[in-house]
Amino acid sequence: IHPGYGFLAENADFAQAVIDAGLIWIGPPPAAMRLLGDKLTARHAAQAAGVPTVPGSDVAVDDLDQARVAAQRIGYPVLIKASAGGGGKGMRVVRSQSELEAALRTAQSEAQSSFGSGIVYFEKYLENVRHVEIQIMADSQGTAVHLGERECSIQRRHQKLIEESPSPVVDADLRARMGSVAVAAALAAQYASAGTVEFLLDKDRNFYFLEVNTRLQVEHPVTEWVTGIDIVLEQFRVAEGKPLSITQDDIRLRGHAIECRIAAEDPFNNFAPSLGTIVSLAEPGGPGVRVDSSLYRGGKVSIYYDPMIAKLIVWAPTREHALMRMRRALEEYGIRGIQTNIPFHLGVLANTAFREGRMDTGFVEVFMSTGWLTHKDAHVEELERTAAYLGALVVDQKRLAGGALGGQPQPLNGKAASHEGSAWRVAGRRQAMR
């Protein structure tokens, strides 16, 4: 059983049940999932291994009194984080004590409903930092490698929206340092299969451990494209008890890959969920373009699933080329019947700071306050052009039906038209005289 990248993929009890049933679990060992999948225990493991972590609480925060003490010690702003799960669920930023009680209650409730555990802890909320993660791969023979980094700073409410590899600011030396820390964490936990070690990176190139995702990531295709390594295939090899087919020396990053998560959300209405039926669908294609989607004409988008409905991934030799290719692919992506966040992605790609690689985890908040909504989406402009064209055709057809051309062109001077007479020319002259 391969669990994909949903919440079951991180559920150690489910993994153990699969194994106990005599089936092959294509994923990390349940023991490693329990150690690293829980953010608090992963934090302890990282600290024991000497990995720098974000300042925070080392125990769960259960009630308001504990929350006040922890927040006072760490210093505002603080980030309340669910110990289980991921995907931005059970997380709240608190900037003052007056916000603490409501945020704690909401985070605990959301964590409980999402992951079956309401355990939360506190971290210092670091601002003006990047979110950079390292893809790791390990086998059961004690070999682990890293496949480079992904830049994941473009996110909203702690949910990633755009990912790319390599990061615009990570050079070979920093990649090696972050990669070695990620590999050490995997080996210390006797990890096997695919996983992701997430870090915060500050402007001085200091990095801090965040958490480990003990599963395949949504954004794994960007790493596959720049490394040429099929991560899922390696997962199958590891699940069969085979060693990795690659070594660290085999891994080279080539070109640049970008992924945009396409969601059924209306960016013009505060990203409200958009429900409905897919009326028409036109997916982009061509060299270096990949679409992961289950959309089809007539398909329903309901409230019962995550709003992400597709992933659009591109690869090109350079980041600049990849940005151009992604923009073209987004402009060609036609989804009718529901609203999507494609206009948002187009706006980000047109942003100068983003194009220059200047971003942090607060990018989207700033971007949304800059009036980007005043710029028309390419889809809107396309519809306007099409409507204008069709309108002109309708008007011309009415004129034809009304006898403006009437079979033979009618002479303007009452005389018969010459053999050089043109119905289009006559119609044009009549239009000019109206």
Q: Locations of the language-model features?
A:
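N-terminal beta-alpha lobe that positions the nucleotide/phosphoryl donor
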Residues: 2-197, 201-217
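Catalytic cores of soluble metabolic enzymes centered on carboxylation/carboxyl-transfer
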Residues: 182, 221-434
